[in-house]
């Protein structure tokens, strides 16, 4: 079992308070979350939010984990082409601004999108930072399926669990809360495009209660493309509705 006491108090407090503001309680022992019934959550003051996940990487194609900086973060040719095609279709969404995250594969995705002339500006947002798998780079699900930290983070959904230099799901969701607060303060009534990671999409969906329970329909095999996924629809470089 993952020892939550190994996580700094300030980090746990940030996660706990950010999620509580959105009506989500965390069991401090297990790190498991659930919605608090009949709670009023903050409003979202923009008109719409969509997200484009970074382009497909070598890690995705090889079913490997990647960190923020590992060499397997480079894009596949297919990933670049899909993102280019998506960039040609953005006019119809009438985006006012695009916000993009701080890691290289997200910045590079933004650059691909902006190779097509767009009608919106791009703003870097440090908080738009999804899961960081430092310590697990180049490993597969089968390398990690018996790892206690992996089990805690991905199977038991412990919001505090992470590798020593990686990040937790709790931090990702707290980051999403910061992004929504930034949007409310700076982009009221606007149509927003986020360029980031798949974990940010899930974090946003959790805050905005898109499912009855935060982790409904989440599977590790689905998130990390375990086994033969040649017939599975992938959303790398593809736009998704958030709000």
List PLM regions with ranges.
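Phosphate-handling substructures
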Residues: 2, 59, 70-77, 114-175
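Short, active-site-adjacent cap segments at secondary-structure transitions
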Residues: 58, 105-107, 130-131, 200-202
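Acidic, low-complexity terminal tails and accessory targeting/binding regions
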Residues: 1-48, 131-143, 185-190, 203-243
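Active-site-proximal alpha-helix that buttresses catalytic centers in soluble enzyme cores
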Residues: 2-117
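General small-molecule cofactor/ligand-binding pocket signal
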Residues: 50, 123-125, 240
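Generic beta-sheet signal
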Residues: 49-50, 190-198
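Active-site catalytic microenvironments for nucleophilic, acid-base chemistry
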Residues: 89, 112-116, 182, 186, ...
């Amino acid at each position: 079992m993952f020892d939550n006491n190994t996580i700094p108090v300030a980090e746990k407090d940030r996660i706990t308070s950010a999620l509580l503001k959105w009506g989500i309680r965390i069991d401090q022992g297990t790190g498991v979350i659930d919605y608090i019934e009949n709670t009023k959550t903050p409003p979202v003051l923009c008109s719409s939010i969509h997200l484009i996940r970074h382009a497909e990487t070598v890690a995705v194609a090889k079913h490997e984990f990647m960190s923020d900086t590992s060499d397997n973060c480079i894009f596949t040719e297919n990933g670049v082409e899909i993102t280019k095609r998506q960039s040609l279709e953005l006019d119809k969404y009438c985006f006012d601004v695009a916000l993009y995250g701080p890691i290289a594969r997200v910045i590079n995705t933004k650059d691909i999108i902006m190779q097509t002339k767009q009608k919106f500006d791009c703003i870097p947002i440090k908080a738009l930072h999804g899961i960081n798998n430092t310590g697990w780079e180049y490993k597969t699900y089968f390398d990690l399926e018996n790892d206690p930290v992996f089990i805690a983070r991905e199977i038991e959904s412990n919001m505090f669990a992470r590798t020593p230099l990686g990040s937790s799901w709790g931090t990702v969701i707290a980051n999403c809360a910061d992004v929504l607060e930034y949007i409310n303060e700076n982009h009221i009534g606007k149509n927003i495009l986020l360029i980031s990671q798949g974990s940010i999409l899930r974090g946003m969906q959790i805050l905005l209660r898109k499912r009855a329970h935060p982790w409904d329909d989440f599977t590790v095999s689905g998130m990390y493309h375990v086994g033969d996924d040649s017939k599975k629809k992938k959303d790398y470089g593809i736009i998704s509705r958030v709000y």
